[in-house]
Amino acid sequence: MADNEFDIDAFFSTEKKSTSSENQHCGFIAIVGRPNVGKSTLLNKILGQKISITSRKPQTTRHRIMGVDTDGDYQAIYVDTPGLHIEEKRAINRLMNRAANSSLSDVNLVFFLVDGTHWTNDDEMVLNKLQKANFPVVLCVNKVDNVQDRNEVMQHMMEMSKKMNFVDVVPISAKQGKNIDVLRKHVRDHLPKAVHHFPEEYVTDRSQRFMASEIVREKLMRFTGDELPYSVTVEIERFDYNPETDGFHINALILVERSGQKKMVIGKGGEKIKTIGREARLDMEELFGRKVYLETWVKVKSGWADDERALRSLGYIDDL
């Protein structure tokens, strides 16, 4: 096994009842929408554990991530996508849009997430793509818990329901888990009879190395300013399990584009990078169930977000 990683199912597993392949149903559900509308939060809530990072800032999700939910004969494979957005000024933005678009191929159902309070040009762009595709779509009106006036929500839902022939229009709160059961029912109704793609204990297709890099990036987004998240990425240079310490030894390289950003990440007296490292380590220990020894470095790599060769080496093109 590469990089001395444990088998992924040792860490991303749940106890499920085994089932005969004769009665199995399996299919793919794409979760799409504009940036920062709650797609990753919804996926985490459906799975009952965190596999996709979240923050208040748009475009937190950069990679296509699969979440696997197996319940008896039914296996639903959810595809969390980067938010589709109109502006494609940089190579990384173009790749994120391509990753999101490629997720719309050969799916059995689409969850289209929108905000319960307003409709944007990015929402319209996603809608146009869905109208051209031949997939059943459930419109998920998220963040309804933020709206006090019930009539306002109903009016907003009525207006949006006219935009396309949706399978259903469901008000949800991804954060609180409201109406997740309704979405699950739609999933079951659309899963074809097919052999399961993943063993029943799997919850994600992503490796521990990938999850470690995403956790560090999440902490960077939470503890730094508004400009930095779009100019930073994380590369895991070492991911080893040491039986003597019964823990993971992880080296994370944080790449920024300018020296000023490096100073921002490190912080006065190194306090910010210490906080980022500590919070990331605690999350990794909870996720992996082992002690984690995390070391972080910050390096300036000018123009990485516009360099397709660099983006390929960092795993962004693997999603396409």
Swiss-Prot record:
Residues 216-302 form the KH type-2 domain. It comes from the Bacteria. One of its GO terms (molecular function) is small ribosomal subunit rRNA binding. GTP binds at residues 33-40, 80-84, 142-145. It is a peripheral membrane protein. Residues 172-174 are annotated as: G5. PROSITE patterns: G_ERA (PS51713), KH_TYPE_2 (PS50823). Gene3D superfamilies: 3.30.300.20, P-loop containing nucleotide triphosphate hydrolases. Residues 33-40 are annotated as: G1. It is found in: Cytoplasm; Cell inner membrane. InterPro entries: G_ERA_dom, GTP-bd, GTPase_Era-like, KH_dom-like_a/b, KH_dom_type_2, KH_sf_prok-type, P-loop_NTPase, Small_GTP-bd. Residues 25-193 form the Era-type G domain. One of its GO terms (biological process) is ribosomal small subunit assembly. GO terms for cellular component: cytosol; plasma membrane. Residues 59-63 are annotated as: G2. Residues 142-145 are annotated as: G4. Pfam families: KH_2 (PF07650), MMR_HSR1 (PF01926). Keywords: Cell inner membrane, Cell membrane, Cytoplasm, GTP-binding, Membrane, Nucleotide-binding, Ribosome biogenesis, RNA-binding, rRNA-binding. Residues 80-83 are annotated as: G3. An essential GTPase that binds both GDP and GTP, with rapid nucleotide exchange. Plays a role in 16S rRNA processing and 30S ribosomal subunit biogenesis and possibly also in cell cycle regulation and energy metabolism. Monomer. Belongs to the TRAFAC class TrmE-Era-EngA-EngB-Septin-like GTPase superfamily. Era GTPase family. This is GTPase Era.
